[in-house]
Amino acid sequence: MEILKLPVGIENFEDIRRSGFYYIDKTMLIEQTLNNWSKVTLFTRPRRFGKTLGMSMLRSFFEIGTDKSLFDGLYISQNKSLCDEYMGKYPVIFISLKDVEGLSYDEAFQVFSRIIGNEISKFSFLAESDKLTVWEKEQFKGLLHIEKGKFIFDKDTFTASLKLLSQLLYKHYGQKVVILIDEYDVPLDKAYQNGYYHEMVSLIRGLFGQALKTNDYLQFAILTGCLRISKESIFTGLNNFEVVSIMDSMYD
């Protein structure tokens, strides 16, 4: 009997599946999420509870061009109709905010800008897409302003970035996007500790407001975090918004 390696510290679903690590099958989460659909779902779980690996799994399932064999032998593969309808069908924007911190707001904003810029860079093919107009290609290039090796955003461009990227991906693929945001609350926690909480709340409220509330190109979004931040602080006006805690048995 083959003894599988334990994936200590590995949070990438594809790496675990390709490298033959032991994997506790959590793919029922995909089925549960789709069967209990909300436009925006926030999963709150304690630290070290597999949130990032779960989000990596969701990306691998929904993302256009995914290797469907990654799910061979797992629970979700038994639901053929669901896999046929949803697997590999969506552009996916995936950002993790677990590293967004700094002793000042400017430091944290620079880290945040790098994370957003790196994700946008993964879609560099949009700059040459024959589905986009010349103006739309210029808009995309405007999201990738780099000086001295750093992504440079003003606040307005930053807060509009995920919504604009969604629009351009929709134009290219003809399909609405899935947005996954991991550890959404870390920047707020770090900001509170270092005295710039209100500035960070304003920034994230603007980013989420455009990406999750007024985004006509959004199929659905899933967020994870340890804390349930007051809806009035950063989720103001979100419709069809669901918070799923560790106490919700339907997501066991």
Regions found by a protein language model. Give the residues of each.
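Phosphate-binding site recognition
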Residues: 1-252
